[in-house]
């Protein structure tokens, strides 16, 4: 193992000098004793003359020139396998939950090759989430990739927590959760939510919060992914949750600027598409096992054409778009049924009935959207009888797309609901066919199945 010394520290960027014959390779991990703490650096560039430029994985407070640096001779390696379940780890795979060491011999490098073309598998099996609007409009594929797009405060994290809870309880598989640059409070809420629903022993948690340096936030997604890859290569169907992909991009932007690269559009890093590809190409299913991933994507200023969300779109099978307009109506989950799409919404995959009901729901909502202008100017009375019926059904459908969540019970006071796909299709088909035209629209708000709406109507 080669030893060098620190020659320059600028925030999270540290330059170290090594003997000319033993310069560390790019992506090698280096270790510095900073007081009593060990700090890990990752080599990003070789500057020549034995000097390497590194990004710190922790705070560089207290570092000084001349400190001894050791080359570990390999990239950052993290523990993998069943020992990681139920534990909270940081970017280096070190436990941060005060429950002692992680007992495992096996450690994998966080930089790995994506599976080759021959190894990839293509499955058309659906993953039932129990959330009506998602199962109907943008069904998820087992081994597929889903993006939850939304601006600030429209419910990305709550939707993700509900998905994890439902899938962990109903499907009893393993999950890995990577918290990338999110709030520590959310990580804490999440941990307690998993403990309360008794699914903590099926989830590995990897956190790199907002207050961590950019190098940490850029690599923490890879740490979580590596743990998921291990479960996949053991032949399991694993779920990978990433909250938030935008912060991964943002950390890349910060690192890129610190390393002195020229920025590209909107100030993002010039390597935006490549960095996203490196992560996304590894999140895939092979003939051995599958990784189904759900990724929250923050949309800056609610602009879906921003380079960061736009780059993410290209990699996904299903996009769930959360809308501020729908949230302001008090309809949660605030999924926009006209903007959300899925590759699986195809009669050959979901069946003709599901496809027809989903498209029927979308077309009636689209017609309602068009009639809104007329209603705003002339009022409801000026509409034809046919259009009045469309509006009445559309408003019922809009309310029936809402649903009480298990993870939001604390806030709403109403118990959560898991609705099977069969019940979802039956309910919406009934509304489209006019079977429930006699019920008031309030009856459809925040209920599970259509039977609950009928019961609620009796009490109104």
UniProtKB/Swiss-Prot annotation:
Protein name: ATP synthase subunit beta
Main location: membrane
Annotated Gene3D superfamilies: 2.40.10.170, Bovine Mitochondrial F1-atpase, Atp Synthase Beta Chain, Chain D, domain 3, P-loop containing nucleotide triphosphate hydrolases
Family the entry assigns: Belongs to the ATPase alpha/beta chains family.
PROSITE patterns xref list: ATPASE_ALPHA_BETA
HAMAP family: ATP_synth_beta_bact (MF_01347)
CDD domains: ATP-synt_F1_beta_C (cd18110), ATP-synt_F1_beta_N (cd18115), F1-ATPase_beta_CD (cd01133)
Subunit structure: F-type ATPases have 2 components, CF(1) - the catalytic core - and CF(0) - the membrane proton channel. CF(1) has five subunits: alpha(3), beta(3), gamma(1), delta(1), epsilon(1). CF(0) has three main subunits: a(1), b(2) and c(9-12). The alpha and beta chains form an alternating ring which encloses part of the gamma chain. CF(1) is attached to CF(0) by a central stalk formed by the gamma and epsilon chains, while a peripheral stalk is formed by the delta and b chains.
Keyword Nucleotide-binding: yes
Taxonomic placement: Bacteria, Pseudomonadati, Pseudomonadota, Gammaproteobacteria, Enterobacterales
Compartment(s) where it occurs, according to its Swiss-Prot or TrEMBL record: Cell inner membrane
């Amino acid at each position: 193992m080669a030893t060098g010394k620190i020659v320059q520290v600028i925030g999270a960027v540290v330059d170290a000098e090594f003997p000319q014959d033993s310069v560390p390779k790019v992506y090698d991990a280096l270790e510095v004793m900073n007081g009593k703490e060990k700090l890990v650096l990752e080599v990003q560039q070789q500057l020549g003359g034995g000097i390497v430029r590194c990004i710190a994985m922790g705070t560089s407070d207290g570092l000084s020139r001349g400190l001894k640096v050791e080359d570990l001779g390999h990239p950052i390696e993290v523990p993998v396998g069943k020992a990681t379940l139920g534990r909270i780890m940081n970017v280096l795979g070190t436990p941060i939950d005060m429950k002692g060491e992680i007992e495992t011999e096996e450690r994998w490098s966080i930089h790995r090759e994506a599976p080759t073309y021959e190894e990839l598998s293509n499955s058309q099996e659906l993953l039932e989430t129990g959330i009506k609007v998602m199962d109907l409009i943008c069904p998820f594929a087992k081994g597929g990739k889903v993006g939850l797009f939304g601006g600030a405060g429209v419910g990305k994290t709550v939707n993700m927590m509900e998905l994890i809870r439902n899938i962990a309880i109903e499907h009893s598989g393993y999950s890995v959760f990577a918290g990338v640059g999110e709030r520590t409070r959310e990580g804490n809420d999440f941990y307690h939510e998993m403990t309360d629903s008794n699914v903590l022993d099926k989830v590995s948690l990897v956190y790199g919060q907002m207050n961590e340096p950019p190098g940490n936030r850029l690599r923490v997604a890879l740490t979580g992914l590596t743990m998921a890859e291990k479960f996949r290569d053991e032949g399991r169907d694993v779920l990978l949750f990433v909250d938030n992909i935008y912060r991964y991009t943002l950390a890349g932007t910060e690192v890129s600027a610190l390393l002195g690269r020229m920025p590209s559009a909107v100030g993002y890093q010039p390597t935006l598409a490549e960095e996203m590809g490196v992560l996304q190409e590894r999140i895939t299913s092979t003939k051995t096992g599958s990784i189904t991933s759900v990724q929250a994507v923050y949309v800056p200023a609610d602009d879906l054409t921003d380079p960061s969300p736009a780059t993410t779109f290209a990699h996904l099978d299903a996009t769930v778009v959360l809308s501020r307009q729908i949230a302001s109506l008090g309809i949660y989950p605030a999924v926009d049924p006209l903007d959300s799409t899925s590759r699986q919404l195809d009669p050959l995959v979901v069946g003709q009935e599901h496809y027809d009901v989903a498209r029927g729901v979308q077309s009636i909502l689209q017609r309602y959207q068009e009639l809104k202008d007329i209603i705003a100017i002339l009022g409801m009375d000026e509409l034809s009888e046919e259009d009045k019926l469309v509006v009445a059904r559309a408003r019922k459908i809009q309310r029936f797309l809402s649903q009480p969540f298990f993870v939001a019970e604390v806030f709403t006071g109403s118990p959560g609901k898991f609705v099977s796909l069969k019940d979802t299709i039956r309910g919406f088909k009934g509304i489209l066919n006019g079977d429930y035209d006699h019920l008031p629209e309030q009856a459809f708000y925040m209920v599970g199945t259509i039977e609950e709406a009928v019961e609620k109507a009796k009490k109104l």
